[in-house]
């Protein structure tokens, strides 16, 4: 027994310091692979934190990472910060430091598509940076050295999110309550699948909105982070998907109180989607 215990401690010591062992194992066998859930603002993540009974906080690079469990899954919740640079830093930390096995972004966005309205949900199948332009060296929107302008969402994750979003919209009176639905005029919100675009500016004028609609007619919604996450996840071969709640039409006609919408609608959407999604997944 003493020899066996000594051998085990010996192995652990070597794993800790990343030295090759005599047993056929690698460091990754001893490293957990949590699921990361990300939002840009605290209001989008607040309801999720309430669902995790055992969360504890770790701070890295000025960010608070909340580690815990939900439906048997190890989960990390984090605010990415607003904008593509902040998003890229957060994505890299999740992968390099926390060894995230997959990343899902939940939050709000401005609607661009013709029939994309306030209260609708958009599950992205692809991502593009609408403010990336290195022409004439490369075609507009193309990411230098990659030869592409869009990065794809993980098909399996996107499909799972679609299924859950359909259920959430069907149960909306229970998720939000009739009072919130009435207050924000949410009658029959729809689910959309398609292109999500990101850029380092808050699109809030009709002129900007129309320009994006003209240049990128296939875009369903616009925000400021997901395309950066998609590129980093592509680099590391980590599955990524995003679901966005439409908070406005990204133009001059926005009449919704954003903070109220965030607390009474978007945060409940995010919590319900993630809760139902993880409850359906088999815990590893």
List each language-model region with its residue ranges.
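Mid-sequence, gly/pro-rich, charge-dense loop/helix-turn segments that line enzyme active sites
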Residues: 113-216
């Amino acid at each position: 027994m003493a020899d066996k215990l000594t051998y085990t401690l010996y192995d652990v010591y070597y794993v800790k310091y990343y030295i090759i062992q005599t047993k056929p194992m690698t460091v990754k066998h001893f490293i957990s692979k949590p699921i990361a859930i990300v939002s840009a603002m605290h209001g989008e993540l607040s309801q999720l934190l309430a669902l995790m009974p055992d969360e504890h906080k770790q701070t890295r690079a000025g960010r608070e990472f909340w580690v815990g469990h939900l439906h048997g899954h190890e989960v990390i919740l984090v605010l990415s910060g607003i904008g593509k640079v902040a998003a890229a830093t957060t994505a890299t930390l999740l992968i390099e430091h926390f060894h995230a096995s997959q990343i899902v972004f939940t939050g709000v966005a401005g609607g661009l598509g013709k029939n994309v309205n306030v209260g609708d949900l958009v599950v992205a199948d692809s991502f593009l940076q609408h403010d990336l332009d290195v022409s004439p060296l490369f075609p507009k929107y193309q990411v230098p050295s990659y030869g592409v302008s869009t990065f794809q969402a993980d098909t399996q994750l996107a499909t799972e999110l679609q299924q859950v979003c359909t259920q959430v919209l069907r149960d909306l009176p229970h998720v939000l309550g009739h009072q919130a639905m009435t207050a924000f005029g949410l009658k029959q919100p729809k689910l959309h699948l398609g292109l999500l675009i990101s850029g380092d500016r808050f699109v809030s004028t009709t002129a900007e909105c129309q320009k994006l609609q003209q240049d990128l007619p296939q875009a369903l919604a616009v925000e400021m982070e997901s395309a950066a996450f998609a590129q980093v996840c592509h680099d590391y071969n980590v599955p990524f998907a995003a679901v966005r709640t439409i908070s406005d039409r990204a133009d001059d006609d926005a009449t919704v109180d954003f903070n109220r919408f965030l607390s009474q609608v978007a945060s409940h959407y995010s919590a319900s989607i993630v809760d139902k999604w993880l409850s359906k997944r088999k815990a590893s």
